[in-house]
């Protein structure tokens, strides 16, 4: 069993997504290992086109992928499930080519909770009214589904009939919040150790904020004790503050996170997890507080330039500049005794042949 290696995973994911994007003019990167592409109106044989995609990804990255083809997102996800499960389809399956009788049999073999978009809680609601399989869901009255699961449930139901209701999002929607959290390598009691961890997590969150050209007006900080240790009390501590004007500068956000942590910190407890949430996100050009005397002051402009310089240096030289509160014994870092090398992102860990 290997420890997590997020730099390698992220880099390989971006390589795979770039290759997939070459096979369609419209691509939606759904997650680190999933992507939707629009195949409509392409002047190719879809099956051979997708086999070429699979081979391209395999040859250039060594990663095997499967492709599900369908007229809607829900059908494409269902087709992908079949492509993975049955080797005879050679990694590509077009669900729209199934005769109706076989399509119904397929739905009967898939539990409703395994449908894309139907979560665990929604599946429990459906089970209570006798809907256990995807076929039961398919045969259910759309009005009942909408009453039980809302408009999202209705969309999933309609997509099983081939009616596209969940559009492609080639431009990701604006984030509503950014969460940065971590289970620590060992339980932390000392405030400075917690502050070191939170400062590091804050800088990562602010980097995401800046990469998406967003700003925030609310900050939530939380720390938890380990709920699995039955001999000790389970404590969840958190606090949210709001600002009158949006901020995006790490020189402003890091001190605020430290202040919030000091407000909620309780000596004597051992905390195993912590993090922060940057909420109420908006584009950087949002209207500032008209009554603030400090906006665009010389000191603010200097701090902003300083932070931009630090971020630029860190992006080029592997996070070489750190805040004082980030320095310490690093006890909070997750254990990575069995981590594989960062073969594609670190000069010192290149694969030696």
Label the predicted regions.
Residues 1-158, 297-353:
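Gly/Gly-Pro- and Ser/Thr-rich, intrinsically disordered tail segments characteristic of DNA damage-repair
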Residues 6, 42, 72, 226-228, ...:
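Generic structural motif
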Residues 35-40, 237-244, 283-294:
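Short, hydrophobic beta-strand segments
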Residues 71-74, 159-163, 215-226, 270-282, ...:
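A glycine-rich phosphate-binding loop feature that marks nucleotide/adenosyl-phosphate handling sites
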Residues 77-79, 231-233, 287-288:
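Short, well-ordered secondary-structure micro-motifs
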Residues 81-85, 223-227, 294:
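Short regulatory "switch" loops immediately downstream of catalytic or recognition motifs
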Residues 114, 124-271:
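DNA-contacting surface of Y-family translesion DNA polymerases
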Residues 259-316:
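C-terminal hydrophobic structural anchor segments
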